[in-house]
Amino acid sequence: MDLAANEISIYDKLSETVDLVRQTGHQCGMSEKAIEKFIRQLLEKNEPQRGPPQYPLLIAVYKVLLTLGLILFTAYFVIQPFSSLAPEPVLSGANSWRSLVHHIRLVSLPITKKYMPENKGVPLQGSQEDKPFPDFDPWSSYNCEQNESEPIPANCTGCAQILPLKVTLPEDTPKNFERLRPLVIKTGQPLSSAEIQSFSCQYPEVTEGFTEGFFTKWWRCFPERWFPFPYPWRRPLNRSQILRELFPVFTQLPFPKDSSLNKCFLIQPEPVVGSKMHKVHDLFTLGSGEAMLQLIPPFQCRTHCQSVAMPIESGDIGYADAAHWKVYIVARGVQPLVICDGTTLSDL
């Protein structure tokens, strides 16, 4: 109010001054044009100026808060970890029935009956009842027979040997690594929630799908890790050491010393069981949850090789030679699935 009253009084004085100048000009015989020019020059030289801001501290605090907000907003998107996995599409009715029929065929397998909860303790027919972990004979989803008259391509020799999928315990694992033979090792050592959370804090570069807010993850990992997000200037990770740190049982297994961990990712339960297959490398570990393992030969080997399917559970370690098999994991059950994807090849 004081500032407005001040400006009004200034303009009143200027108006009086202009009237006085105009009268004086007329008395001195000046022309109207000369008087207007003189008044314009007078007004330009005496234009009223606004005073300094009345609350400089408040304005300074406002600018600081605005700048800090912009910095935090930018930093959030710069260091935001990998976004969550895209939601899986719900299959149409035809595809749902196809998936249902596919799983009905899986349930009819002897190995599936062995591991289903309602069939625990029911012995298998024949000599299989004496074996705790029998070799799993492959089955073909195409019911195709091998054509012995056709030559076997070089990249199909591994799966064409019909080596059964060996299911074993860690202490019964062969001492020598057999690269061509598929293997499932039942360790019975799943990852706990605390181990998974600690691992995601320590090695955020090798985790994916663990959706958390920026400040939520920072607060959970503090003070163990000050900045639990991937950043480009960090030293390269020793992924072989990380694999054995997360799963100490690998120190007792015959896999190559340079076997390494590629990534651990979290998969939420799917609306339609079996609607999504997740491809992994030749070596993997099921940290938690239940899944179906599927080994599919390359397309050019379908006439000589057969697909393999088997249910797996938390703590299971699987291996299949990537040159002869495509390895897929299909989530099942209602619990989230944690898959740690690795490899026995040093160049990956």
From Swiss-Prot:
Extracellular side: 80-348
InterPro entries: BRAP (IPR038757)
PTM per Swiss-Prot/TrEMBL: Glycosylated.
Chain ranges passing through the membrane: 59-79
UniProt topology in membrane: Single-pass type II membrane protein
Topological domain spans for side Cytoplasmic: 1-58
Subcellular location: Golgi apparatus membrane; Cytoplasm
Keywords (A to Z) from UniProt: Cytoplasm, Glycoprotein, Golgi apparatus, Membrane, Signal-anchor, Transmembrane, Transmembrane helix
Domain of life, source organism: Eukaryota
Gene Ontology terms describing biological process: autophagy; chromatin remodeling; collagen metabolic process; connective tissue replacement; epithelial cell proliferation; fibroblast proliferation; positive regulation of cell cycle; response to bleomycin
One annotated Gene Ontology cellular component of this protein: Golgi membrane
Subunit structure: Homodimer. Interacts with BRS3. Interacts (via N-terminus) with SIN3B.
Its job: Exhibits histone deacetylase (HDAC) enhancer properties. May play a role in cell cycle progression and wound repair of bronchial epithelial cells.
UniProt protein name: Bombesin receptor-activated protein C6orf89 homolog
Organism: Mus musculus
